[in-house]
Amino acid sequence: MDFQVVIFILCYLIGSIPFGFILSYVIGIGDIRKTGSGNIGATNVFRKNKKLALLTLLLDALKSFICVAIAQKYNIDNTILFLAALFAIIGHMFPVYLFFKGGKGVAPLLGSLIFIDYRVAVCFLTFWIICFLLCKYASLSSIVSTLIALLFICTCYTIVQSVIFTITALLIITQHTDNIIRMLNKSENKINLKL
């Protein structure tokens, strides 16, 4: 088996680690999939425990950061970093450990961007915060910041890397389909940041 394939499989398996699910059980919340949107990401955890959501966000970002770091250690081609990030994010969205029902990939995207290009990560986070302060929708903020990151990647990186990131961005946006429908119907819940 090609060693790069082994790296991608490893990235998928690391990306599949459901920190939101695990942490929720550890502190006694129970199955986070039975709450709110039903996914295991930080936004849904936030509905039950705001401080735990921050830890979930950090760990979900860290796992993709680690995946990209592993890919760089064994391959100097930056394109492999984008593929490693993609597989980690796919693992987060469709975790093998939870019957392929996971999160939406936003935190792992941030983690991978921090490693690949911190400038894009800063833009991503900045636009997420600005959009959130204006609308209070985590989903819309995630979509907008993902598109901003896509614009930067397509401007500054190779065609192949841009295509890989476009696929990543489309997957993340597709994961927000239900949120988009609710926003159009004016039934999407806003997030209250008060602790």
Swiss-Prot record:
Pfam families: G3P_acyltransf. It is found in: Cell inner membrane. The chain crosses the membrane at residues 7-27, 52-72, 80-100, 113-133, 147-167. GO terms for cellular component: plasma membrane. Keywords: Cell inner membrane, Cell membrane, Lipid biosynthesis, Lipid metabolism, Membrane, Phospholipid biosynthesis, Phospholipid metabolism, Transferase, Transmembrane, Transmembrane helix. Its EC number is 2.3.1.275. Belongs to the PlsY family. This is Glycerol-3-phosphate acyltransferase.
